[in-house]
């Protein structure tokens, strides 16, 4: 079934900064070549972090100087700071500039090999033990439930931007390694290598909250799919377990994407708008968009058909 066409292709050279809109890109097991090739380490917390360091990170933008390869170190990227000042990943001042902007000590890192597990490990005590136990989905579900009952879910509520009385998302379907590491080792994406969003979903929530600032850029998808006539509503939320053919690529639809506080923050060209997340929590079951993994590599370009198999 043809569900639409690729309207936009996006790559994000530096985790949590504004990305690059592309005409097309090769996609491998780790997603679009060069996607999230760089990230910041919060030296005070002792781990890799995204916009939870400071929402100001989302007011920055990054652009590669050269096209990335499938493997190996990412190319250097130019960075535009709020107000228009320029720096880059190879600027000797970049760590100081970003630390001053964010109000805490940070350092910039390219992707490290997956074997460098210490680089990706969470700073929390007993991260290795938690990672081992989290191989069981039942443990993940019970542990999150116990945190809620014990009132120890404050950090989760802050990260996910939940107000009192709002539910927390069910994170038990996320990869087990996310409970030990800040991202799957060898990557800087949150959970899965590809994130997809449809115009049908955007339109559906815009109808429910027409005064909110709905814009695909706010949700940082790799692919924005313009859905065909007759395809309406939160369609991708029902695609879990199915396969998508996107251009020359085949994707396995893994799970709906749980949304966090990043969606309400001001970004380049977009205002801060808490109504966005309030609507997602109330009207979309806390999820918006789709996480996917790569079944077979290929190239995707704007205009390519998207087929649900």
Region roles according to the model:
Residues 1-309:
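Metal-cofactor-dependent catalytic cores
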């Amino acid at each position: 079934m043809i569900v639409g066409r690729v309207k936009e292709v996006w790559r994000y050279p530096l985790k949590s900064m504004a990305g690059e809109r592309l005409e097309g890109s090769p996609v491998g097991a780790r997603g679009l070549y060069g996607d999230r090739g760089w990230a910041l380490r919060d030296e005070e917390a002792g781990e890799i972090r995204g916009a939870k360091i400071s929402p100001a990170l989302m007011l920055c933008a990054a652009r590669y100087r050269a096209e990335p390869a499938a493997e190996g170190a990412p190319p250097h990227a130019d960075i535009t700071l709020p107000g228009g000042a320029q720096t880059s990943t190879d600027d000797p001042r970049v760590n100081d500039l970003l630390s001053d902007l964010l109000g805490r000590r940070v350092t910039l890192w390219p992707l490290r090999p997956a074997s460098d597990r210490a680089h990706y490990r969470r700073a929390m005590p007993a991260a290795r033990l938690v990672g081992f136990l989290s191989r069981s989905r039942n443990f993940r579900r019970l542990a999150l439930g116990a945190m809620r009952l014990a009132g120890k879910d404050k950090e989760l509520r802050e990260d996910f931007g939940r107000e009192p009385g709002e539910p927390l998302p069910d994170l038990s379907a996320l990869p087990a390694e996310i409970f030990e590491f800040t991202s799957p080792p060898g990557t800087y994406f949150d959970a899965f290598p590809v994130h997809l969003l449809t115009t049908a979903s955007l339109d559906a929530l815009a109808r429910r909250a027409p005064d909110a600032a709905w814009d695909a850029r706010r949700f940082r998808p790799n692919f924005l799919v313009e859905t065909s006539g007759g395809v309406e509503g939160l369609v991708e939320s029902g695609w879990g377990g199915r396969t998508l053919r996107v251009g020359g690529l085949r994707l396995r639809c893994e799970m709906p994407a749980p949304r966090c506080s990043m969606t309400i923050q001001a970004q380049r060209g977009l205002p801060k708008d808490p109504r966005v997340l309030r609507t997602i929590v109330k009207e979309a079951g806390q999820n918006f968009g789709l996480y996917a993994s790569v079944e077979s590599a290929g190239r995707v370009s704007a205009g390519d058909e998207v087929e649900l198999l």
